[in-house]
């Protein structure tokens, strides 16, 4: 299911990932790989949160990091900037599912907050 021969099609069923991705890490990677199994293509939506709370990375940096991490899936992903979405609401019979993907305990322990703290200690982030 890698991306080389695949051609993105907006009409095909598509899964959505919504998040801050500050920064993209192995937990996000595993989540992406599980979500990709659902439909074969994923729209990764990046909330516009640069400068809000502890969100040091701008959209272009986040997008670059995602594409670098997912280069083998490049034709199966779109990365889009969206407003700072905090609520997802829907009416009945909308034609899509909202699903929680539960990953293994080790993956769930990965913390972007701790990653940012380590990056600051190493001088890689202000």
Spans of model-derived segments:
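Nucleotidyltransferase catalytic core that binds NTPs
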Residues: 1-126
